[in-house]
Amino acid sequence: VWAVDWDRKLFDELIPLPEGTSYNSYYIEGSEKTALIDTVDPAKTQELFNNLDYLNVKKIDYVIANHAEQDHSGSLPAVIKKFPGAKIVTNEKCKGFLKDFMPELNDGDFITVADKQEISLGNRTLQFYLAPWVHWPETMMTFLKEDRILFPCDFFGSHVAISDPFDTAHTYTSAKRYYAEIMSPFRNVIKKNMEIVRSINPAMICPSHGVVHTDPARVMGWYDEWIKDDVKNYAIILYISMHHSMKAAAYHLADSLANKGVRTKLYNLSNVDIGEIAMDLVDAATVIVCAPTVLAGAHPVAASIVYLFNALRPKTKFLSLITGWNWIEKAQESLAAMVPNFKGELIAPLKVQGYPKKGDLEAIEAMAQAVADKHKSINIM
């Protein structure tokens, strides 16, 4: 009983949605009780109700809230108003979040559950698995035991608007993009929860965004690849240039890396989809940022991308900087201070005064050689 948002182009006022998105809600009918797994964004509440009416749903006993974020919980007040007597089933932490976000909810609207607790619908049973920090601290998953269907909310999701939830034509790219943008900071926690998912052996995985996975082994195999510590012989160059100096440096670096056998991708930060960068960060061994000094600091666009790099906590092994300046150089210092989460190695950065000259170009070539040597040292070349 989902709602498809064909027109939404931005999530959290940050993440581009080139393919739109969907908010997946699932209705389960047992012999004695009924349940609704998650709701939809409040802008799409009426679509949810239209779908429930189409199924002639007259009564809902339980509304499962796997996650408090409003794209899944925002219709809760309207749902319990439409279906008097319906109880919101969630964990204690999520209950607190929901009451913060929607003050009209009160304690009497809730049933709280603990890890592995079950609720019977008669001939069907819901079991709950707490999964803190698989995105948010209150996240949980719901398992329909008899049918072996897992409802993991954002886990295994994808931002894509499609007319058929079983359409797997472009699942890989949308799933990787979603993982990269939203789930990758929690990579180590996801490793543990992958073990939980394998232990219950679902026949189907039904996330709260995007495609339903009728072949769980496929998407779980992708996640296994993305969460492991291995990186690839791949360097991404992130540059911003006001008067072509940093562009020249970035292009020369890209050519030098390619000549030394390092697969390379160049991003002009003045016009970039951050989702594409996030996807590349899942695999890249090396990241190099090229940015000029602006008002005694790093260019703000470069600073914002470096901030995101730090927040995403990628498994990148090597990082370096090329910074431009004329009368004062402060970009390097400010950018280097913005990556406390980076646990890899900083390759000696460079400073370029004005347009890159012969000595600068030679130093850039030496940086490319250093990157290639580092890649060889970890056996990816």
Residue ranges and their predicted role:
Residues 43-89:
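Active-site metal-binding motif and surrounding structural segment of the metallo-beta-lactamase
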Residues 162-165, 170-205, 210-211, 252-265, ...:
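FMN-binding flavodoxin-like domain, especially the glycine-rich phosphate-binding loop
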Residues 37-39, 60-68, 88-91, 150-154, ...:
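Active-site neighborhood of phospho(di)ester-bond hydrolases with catalytic His/Asp-centered motifs
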